[in-house]
Amino acid sequence: MGYDVTEYMARYLRGETDIPMRRHRVLAVTCADSSRWIVDAGIGQAAFRRPLPFAEGAERTINGETYHVVKKDFYGWVIEDWHNGAWRPFYGFTEEVQLNLDYIMPSFWCEKHPDSPFTKANMLSIKTDTGRCTLDGNTFRCFDGDTVTEKELTDEEIPSVMDSVFGIRL
């Protein structure tokens, strides 16, 4: 297909005060022209939607959100986003190649461990053409450019929103 994919494991840094475990899959894509790109399926928060150049100092603005790539001694390659007038760390990864089996333990931790943020409440996100919609616990938000709409859902409303917005039928 004209490109090679290498998988890495990242430490999600946004909002962390301690060094977090590696638990996020990141792809590095090398194209036929030797250009390298960082590719990510995303998370439920603001995250880059299109590949970032895999080069120190690279910067890209996507749908009004600006990201850049820096190198740090401990974290390796760090993706940062411009937020409230300052660069905010998003995640960091080193270039240690990962295999599918390397994701089993972090995936299990995310799904089952009592300290995992994913075991505490509903956590869904879907990208839209102009933003994203999220369900975090009972809080439903849609981000459309600079506009955010928010609604606290009742437990009875959640199945309908999961179906109509996220395509999940309970």
Region locations from a protein language model:
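Hydrophobic/aromatic-rich core segments of domains that either
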Residues: 3-68
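N-terminal accessory/pre-domain segments preceding catalytic cores
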Residues: 72-170
